[in-house]
Structure formats: structure tokens, C-alpha cells
């Protein structure tokens, strides 16, 4: 058996091929795993569990089917779907996790997270993140009519794309000291995250040993997952 990790699918009604690829992944790959961990940005945006549109219902149903077949499904919020809540979790059968979680897998300590908290050089984004994770701001936003929330989400998405085009590639990647500090805080052997869309396995020298940082790819033109067994940890890309 195995444990699977994915992130950054950015599912939306505008990308039906990605949705179809994810549904196929659930039917063919996830169903054979012990557990599936979704490390954020499953959806391109999330404006509340009451946005019960056909895509959300389809994904919830597919995840529920996997869970009913005995595969535990876990979710860590990303920067696009941090408002995903308990109602969707109940409908889909997923288990919501904190933003950082250590797993004991096959004799290794594996830290999982979305990854945006490691990008500390992007000070503008970190200020934004702090604001939108403020509980009273979230509560106020969720009280707005759904149509208003949809308009705000579209405007914020367009603004984010415009701002990111003006940022350097380096500033949007992880800060190495933040990575080291996080490894030390959790005493992990491996770290797996998404967010940066730069799939790779990095060796990180740490005191008298080497630890590993695995980065998941985004599901733009192909799927990306980490597969962990008792014998190996593999970063795998696959066609939709």
C-alpha cells in the first residue's frame, strides 16, 4: 500500500480537462492508497461552503466515494481555498488538518504543509495572508451575499495575477532559512509542500544529516503527486 500527496489543482469550471484528470486520478490511483493528502489549492478559489455549485458537488461526491472505499482523505488549506469549511468536509468525507502537520510514515517523520508560509521574502503576500486569515474578517466576508463574494473573488484573482507578474521569480520561492527553521522546529526527515509550482526534491543539509524537501507540481498540463511506500518516496508526473 502507499500514501499519496497532491496540491495545486486549482479546479474551476473553466478547466474541465483538469477536473476530468482529477476524477480519473481518484478512480484509478487514490482508490489503491491507504491515504490521500491534499495540500491546498484544490480549488482555484473558495468563497464559502454555501457556494454549492455543480463542480463542488461533483468533487465532493467523488471524494466521498474514495473515502467510502476505505481511503482516508485529508486536506490542508491553501492560499486559494482557505475558507473551505466543515460543511464541505462533511459532504466530501475529507478530514481538515492544521496548516502544518507531522506524519509518522514508514519510519520517517514527514512534515506536510501548503508552502506559502515558507515564502517569507514576499512580504506583501505575507501581509495579505495575515489579513485574510484574521477570524473576524473571514466571518464578515462570509456574511456577504454570495453574488458579492463572487465579484470580490474575481477582482482579487485578477489583482493577484497582475501583482505576481511584476514580482521576481526568486521572491515567490521559499526562503531557505524559513525552510531550515521549520525542519528544526518539527525535527522532520522530509517536508512535502506545494504552492510554488516548482516540482523537485531538494536535499537540505541540516547539522550532521541531510533532510529532504519535496515540492509538488501544479496540475496545469499534467498531474503531480508524491507516492510514499515502505521502500521509497517518489515524485511522479502523469498525463491527464
Curated annotation (Swiss-Prot):
Membrane-spanning parts: none
A Pfam family it matches: Metallophos
Listed pathway(s): Glycolipid biosynthesis; lipid IV(A) biosynthesis; lipid IV(A) from (3R)-3-hydroxytetradecanoyl-[acyl-carrier-protein] and UDP-N-acetyl-alpha-D-glucosamine: step 4/6
Keywords linked to the UniProt accession: Cell inner membrane, Cell membrane, Hydrolase, Lipid A biosynthesis, Lipid biosynthesis, Lipid metabolism, Manganese, Membrane, Metal-binding
Keyword Translocase attributed: no
Binding site residues for Mn(2+) 2: 41, 79, 114, 195
Main location: membrane
EC nos: 3.6.1.54
Keyword hit for ATP-binding: no
Domain of life assignment: Bacteria
Binding site for Mn(2+) 1: 8, 10, 41, 197
Compartments where located: Cell inner membrane
UniProt protein name: UDP-2,3-diacylglucosamine hydrolase
Amino acid at each position: 500500500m502507499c500514501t499519496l500527496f497532491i496540491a495545486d489543482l486549482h479546479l474551476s469550471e473553466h478547466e474541465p480537462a483538469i477536473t476530468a484528470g482529477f476524477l480519473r486520478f481518484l478512480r484509478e490511483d487514490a482508490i489503491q492508497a491507504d491515504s490521500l493528502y491534499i495540500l491546498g489549492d484544490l480549488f482555484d478559489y473558495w468563497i464559502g461552503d454555501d457556494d454549492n455549485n455543480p463542480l463542488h458537488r461533483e468533487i465532493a461526491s467523488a471524494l466521498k466515494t474514495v473515502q467510502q472505499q476505505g481511503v482516508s482523505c485529508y486536506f490542508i488549506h491553501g492560499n486559494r481555498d482557505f475558507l473551505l469549511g466543515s460543511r464541505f468536509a462533511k459532504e466530501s468525507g475529507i478530514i481538515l488538518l492544521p496548516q502544518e502537520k507531522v506524519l509518522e510514515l514508514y519510519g520517517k517523520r514527514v512534515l506536510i504543509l501548503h508552502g506559502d508560509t515558507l515564502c517569507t521574502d514576499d512580504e506583501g503576500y505575507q501581509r495579505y495572508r495575515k489579513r485574510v486569515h484574521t477570524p473576524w474578517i473571514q466571518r464578515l466576508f462570509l456574511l456577504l451575499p454570495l453574488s458579492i463574494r463572487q465579484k470580490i473573488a474575481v477582482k482579487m484573482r485578477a489583482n493577484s495575477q497582475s501583482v505576481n507578474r511584476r514580482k521576481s521569480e526568486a521572491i515567490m520561492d521559499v526562503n531557505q532559512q524559513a525552510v531550515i527553521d521549520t525542519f528544526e522546529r518539527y525535527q522532520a526527515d522530509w517536508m512535502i509542500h506545494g504552492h510554488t509550482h516548482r516540482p523537485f526534491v531538494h536535499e537540505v543539509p541540516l547539522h550532521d544529516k541531510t533532510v529532504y524537501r519535496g515540492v509538488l507540481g501544479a496540475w496545469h498540463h499534467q498531474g503531480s503527486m508524491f507516492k510514499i511506500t515502505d521502500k521509497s518516496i517518489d515524485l511522479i508526473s502523469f498525463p491527464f
